Design a protein with these regions (language model features):
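N-terminal, charge-rich interaction modules
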Residues: 1-47
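Helix-rich interaction surfaces within compact, conserved domain-sized segments
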Residues: 3, 16-24, 30, 77, ...
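Short, charged/polar micro-motifs that form catalytic or ligand-binding hotspots
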Residues: 8, 66, 70-71, 96-100
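Short beta-alpha junction loops
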Residues: 11, 35-37, 73, 99-103
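Short, intrinsically disordered low-complexity segments
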Residues: 37-68
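Noncatalytic linker/hinge segments flanking ATPase motor cores
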Residues: 45-51, 70-75, 106-115
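Mid-chain, well-packed structural core segment of small domains
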Residues: 57-87
Length: 128
């Protein structure tokens, strides 16, 4: 699998900063459009075994920025996170690696899961 980052819900300014990081790391970047939120993340990453869906997303849910790293080694991930921290982006709260488990999930499903995990890890869970 080729190295690619899927970027969800980035403003044009923050997307430009991410593009610079990707150029420096020689990594492909794909900005995912809102209407593609229902597409399986594996399909968007170019996995031939994951099929697309015909439905386009038109809702308001899932506004948070999210990065999905595909085909990354641990060293690649460390370099990306260091570049984000040192650069204009500073941080992106929701991040994940493409896995055999999440490759069939939609971007919206992954956003929901990561948002819940992030809230729990930062003590924002009402069920505590």
């Amino acid at each position: 699998m080729q190295k690619i980052i899927l970027a969800y819900n980035f403003t044009p300014e923050r997307l430009q900063a991410l593009k610079l990081i990707c150029m420096m790391l020689r990594t492909q970047l794909r900005a995912v459009a809102r209407e593609e939120l229902l597409q399986p993340v594996g399909y968007l990453a170019g996995l031939p075994e994951v099929a697309s869906v015909s439905e386009a997303y038109s809702g308001d849910e899932g506004q948070e920025e999210m990065l999905l790293m595909c085909g990354f080694s641990r060293q690649d991930l460390d370099r990306l996170l260091a570049a984000v921290k040192k650069g204009k982006l500073r941080q992106v709260a929701l991040k994940a690696m493409l896995t055999p488990t999440n490759c069939t999930w939609s971007g919206l499903q992954l956003l929901r899961e990561l948002s819940q995990e992030h809230a729990y890890m930062h003590g924002k869970n009402a069920d505590k």
